[in-house]
Amino acid sequence: LVDCGMEQGPDLYVNQDIPVNPSEIDYILITHAHIDHSGNIPLLVKKGFSGEIITTFATADLCDIMLRDSAHIQEFEAEWRNRKARRSGEPEYEPIYTVADADAATKLLAPVDYGQKITLCDGIEVRFNDVGHLLGSASIEVWVTEGEVSKKIVFSGDVGNKNQPIIKDPQLVKEADYVVIESTYGDRTHGEDIPDYVGEFTRILRETFQKGGNVVIPSFAVGRTQEILYFIREIKEKNLLPEFPGFEVYVDSPLAIEATNVFNKNVKGCFDEDAMALVNQGINPLLFQGLKTTITSDESRQINFDTKPKVILSASGMCEAGRIRHHLKHNLWRPECTICFVGYQAVGTLGRKLIEGAQSVKLFGENITVNAKIEVLRGISGHADMNGLLDWLAGFEKVPDRVMVVHGEDTVTDHFAALVEEQFGCPAFAPYSGGSVDLATNEIITIGQKIPKKA
């Protein structure tokens, strides 16, 4: 099994059961640690999976903290629902999985190095290659032999955006009979220019600090928070804000703090040339004067009693949960403050409402007027765009026998599959859930079924 993620957020597809008994699976291969790729693995363990979970060292470290965090959220949500259920006499809600299930899953992690070809069992070999999406992220080459027939399948995982800070650009793979590729941005581009993140971010900080306000950044705890710390270290090192030399930066997310420690542990083999040049000079690319971390709720609350202009980085990135909602409550109404978005905001989320110009939002049962300036750091993305995906596919020296397009909205997967056929001249297939292909004959067996959305 390659990846087993969890659907998250409102109005998304039901988490479907996989079409095999988890106890019959021997190996799970994980491309990277994001919950939409790893989040359902503890559920498989709960249902009987006891094999090995193969992934890179950095992904194993991130899964160790992220799956436990996900389990804490399931338990907290179940307890909240059950308090309401007990009052109304409804049956109790069981969490999807527990912290004990997540702990059991992490004990099955079996990490490997990038570029290391390993034999899983008779007839199956695998190799993980850096795909530049997140620390530890990989595309996976799988060699399968059955009888006299051998085929090679390459799973792209999530292909990274070029020129991201800290991590390397996506590595190309030279050959495959079949390719399974993501298509998150398979119908759009990020723009031709490399954005000047540091320059734009410096402008936002200067304009806000001059008014005496805070810059509040809703940020994904893993990946995006570390990129922002990287930019701020550069701003401070180059003295780009000489009028505010000692400004403080709070990372107010226990998961983000743990993830930053994982980044610092997995420097070699994961960091790009620029980040490694700093490391080799004895400089931690994610550390600087004025950086403060808050673990406890009390420490978090104290941030809003400090009147000095500062940066507050907190999760969740779409403002749907977590400590960020408290910081929004204390800063949204203040015209001198700025809320700076640095990641995708899904439809229906509080973050999306704010970037679309909401004049008032409800937080903790209270209507909060939006007086703060809303900024978006454009172009910052961990995903390759349409051209980046095509560039990655162009790395194959021989055109694959077939390309399977997954991991995108249904109209986007169809669009990108047509684009692949047009550009490379090979059959491309955008399956629905349950779609299947005979790898020996290259025939589509089933197209699959569109999954109904939740009511």
Place the predicted regions along the sequence by residue.
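His/Asp/Glu-rich metal-coordinating catalytic cores
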Residues: 1-29, 38, 45-227, 233-244
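A short helix->loop->beta-strand "cap" motif at the edges of active sites that frequently abuts
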Residues: 48-52, 211-213, 244-247, 336-337, ...
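Short internal beta-strands
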Residues: 52-60, 83, 180, 245-258, ...
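A polyampholytic, Gly/Pro-enriched intrinsically disordered region
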Residues: 74-79, 267-281, 362, 445-455
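Short, surface-exposed amphipathic charged segments that create phosphate/polyanion-binding patches used
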Residues: 124-128, 262-270, 390-391, 440-451
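Hard-cation-handling environments
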Residues: 202-347, 362
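Generic long, charged, amphipathic alpha-helical segments
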Residues: 362-393
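C-terminal structured "cap/appendage" subdomains that terminate the fold
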Residues: 389-426
